[in-house]
């Protein structure tokens, strides 16, 4: 490692743990932090420095930590043959055949960027029929841009057990062993890390379904060969079977290096309010869609399974992240966590978390804070929608009063919960500017606000992206600004004067 000393000076240094940025410096020797201090302490480092970089009013801060990512979902966007230029299914067949000829050991033919016109409700069956005719018993799966929908033939449906209407990551688990083994998918992890690094992300909590279907070997290889530029805390999300504690114990022992660790388990409880699948404390409004009117949830989550898994996971020393969108699911989860062993201060022994928390009752946030709970929120989520498109649906489903309890990051922070940030990548791609715009300003994509009393301050959000994420990943002794830790990121904006409405222009760089 180089012994070169670089000193970064800035009018705005944010450590991730303090309340305010300060004028000061960060001294970096090689790729390790040697010192952090105020402007009064910089002189001796300037005299030793091989290079001094004055960043002016740009903020110097630790790398961002994204606590909810899916490489398995990201990889679908470039899986197989690029079909973006095809005009019809027959043209797609030619490209798919060429790809399959180049991949004789792969059980299926895959494609991406299939034009939406060939996957729409009207044409999906016709495209699938062409694939049936031309490929017979060879499975064919082609994803549209963004991999939100797909076309698959009968052979693929039989082998993988999902449909074109539901081809998101949790549904395609039977396909993972086929595509995660592909050389280009394994090589693609380098581009994935580069994308994260370019956005200031230096650590992630990665959702690795079941036993990761062979991809854990790739992570071990990259750790051993020094090819990782992102610290990865892997979570097993049970989809093909229940929580595999035998695999978890093995992974905990296997991954003990500076980059890859095994963190525990992740599971969905309920789902979206729009579909009546978010479990609410009180029934949905009489105006609710999707058959939810008068019910607290259309399909009850598997609470017995979740409770049994949680107790076994906790007893074995692992942590669990439970994904909750409705206030009823949040309440049930807080109660489950409260029933687990705690320390002398009443705090959970394991770092159990709740992910998303789209809607939550403030009293449950207070109880979760007493437990030392962790809230993994999606700070950019409002940027996906226009305000009235989202709020009109929410009003129909849960009404105006409960709408006020949505995206309540203020309540989480004030209740003493540890708040940290995730993107559900590839649903969202990490963007510090977008997260300030959404989580500090409360703005939707069209610039109109919601629940402004529920937002975080800028410093609270930056802390969530850094120190909060480090605590969630159990890496607080490795991340942040302390001697010996790896280097930082800087922002093209002063943290003290960024206005949320203008923050979308804020970017992070390595």
Cite the ranges covered by each PLM segment.
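Non-cysteine beta-strand/loop elements that form the S-adenosyl-L-methionine
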Residues: 70, 257-277, 373-383
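Divalent metal-binding segments
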Residues: 3-9, 14, 18-247, 272-282, ...
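His/Asp/Glu-enriched, well-ordered alpha-helical/loop segment
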Residues: 176-177, 311-320, 328-352, 357, ...
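A short helix-to-beta-strand connector/capping loop
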Residues: 48-49, 228, 257-261, 348-351, ...
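Acidic (Asp/Glu)-rich catalytic clusters
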Residues: 222-225, 250-260, 347, 368-370
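Extended low-complexity acidic/polar segments
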Residues: 136-137, 254-258, 287-288, 366-391
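Active-site-proximal glycine-rich helix-loop-beta segment
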Residues: 68, 372, 489
